[in-house]
Amino acid sequence: MLRLLIGLLLMSFISLQSASWQEPLRVSIEFVDLPKKIIRFPAHDLQVGEFGFVVTKLSDYEIVNSEVVIIAVENGVATAKFRAFESMKQRHLPTPRMVARKGDLVYFRQFNNQAFLIAPNDELYEQIRATNTDINFISSDLLVTFLNGFDPKIANLRKACNVYSVGVIYIVTTNTLNILSCESFEILEKRELDTSGVTKTSTPFFSRVEGIDAGTLGKLFSGSQSKNYFAYYDALVKKEKRKEVRIKKREEKIDSREIKREIKQEAIKEPKKANQGTQNAPTLEEKNYQKAERKLDAKEERRYLRDERKKAKATKKAMEFEEREKEHDERDEQETEGRRKALEMDKGDKKEERVKPKENEREIKQEAIKEPSDGNNATQQGEKQNAPKENNAQKEENKPNSKEEKRRLKEEKKKAKAEQRAREFEQRAREHQERDEKELEERRKALEAGKK
């Protein structure tokens, strides 16, 4: 009991003395190197490994354009690497194309008042919660449910932090309480903690949730290594620490001469004034900005040219379609006109054929009535001779009438067929013209939509 009280007092004293990483901080960027994706700003009390995000203020709103991790602190200047902001990645939302620039604000420790706590048993869990009243500890039940029976990995812990807006993770290892940044997994603070009295541990850590099973395949891949609590979490923290040391050494291999030259250029606030009032040579930061802007302009130019080519192709296709439509209409009009003329000529021929039989009948009748009848002087023999002549004339009149009737019926049938074909042709021509007009209208609408 005495040991527990001493531990509580020690933890309370340490928590009161080291709370700088909990207070939110906002700093302004003083230097940007776009090719290397490095920014510099006043360090204040920032530590290596702390995570933040860059905010750019526009006309009437602000936008988060990138996230940063501090890689070095020297002479009151913090150096950080920045990358695309992916903590709230959502493929259905627009992706910002802006990058960090001088004058933007970097926000740190915005979520450091919320934390996950990984402890081996309920005693240490409640002890740490009681001695850190200024921290809002998210229930470990949520974290163990999120892991779904698998061993805690750094990638999974980062995802859980993003889901629940958590900034730090408290992990109990052998005789140590480690406070790590969620995003960089860098150790922000270490506190001594007596764990010699721990005889029984929970898997993967203490929580009130039981019965979560990853299944046979899940156990095969996860390995259930967290059953040995202290061995697993000691190795997890040391592994990440070795990784961060390697990253730090790799970042320190950046050309020191170039860094010193850049710092000197930034230290000179007032540019040298030329005698003739000429403009000064651009600084390294301005060159980097100009280079990045040229890249963006080149991309925009390529995109603009690609869109223009597409529009030109669409316009050319529309013009070709209109020309083909005009040619087709002209050809249809010529064919229709030819059919109409042929039909009119057929009608004229039939009228002439109808007039000729009538004229023939009149001529026959007139010839028959040329010789006057001499009733008083005509003999019976003359009457007998005239009778067969009249019968023959009637037969001749009947014969031409029957032939003309047949011819007339044939001509009427031909005329009916020609009229029917002409009507069918006109109907097909109208349908074809309507269909072409609809297609042309659809092409024009598509072209207008493409131009917009």
Swiss-Prot record:
Q: Where is the composition biased (Basic and acidic residues)?
A: 284-310, 317-373, 392-452
The record's Gene Ontology cellular component field reads:
cell surface
Q: Outcome of mutating R91S, per the record?
A: In strain: CCUG 17874
Q: Name one Pfam family in it.
A: PGBA_N
Q: Which domain of life is it from?
A: Bacteria
Q: What is its main location?
A: other
- Quote the protein name from its UniProt record: Plasminogen-binding protein PgbA
Report the source organism. Answer: Helicobacter pylori (strain ATCC 700392 / 26695)
What is the taxonomic lineage of the source species?
Answer: Bacteria, Pseudomonadati, Campylobacterota, Epsilonproteobacteria, Campylobacterales
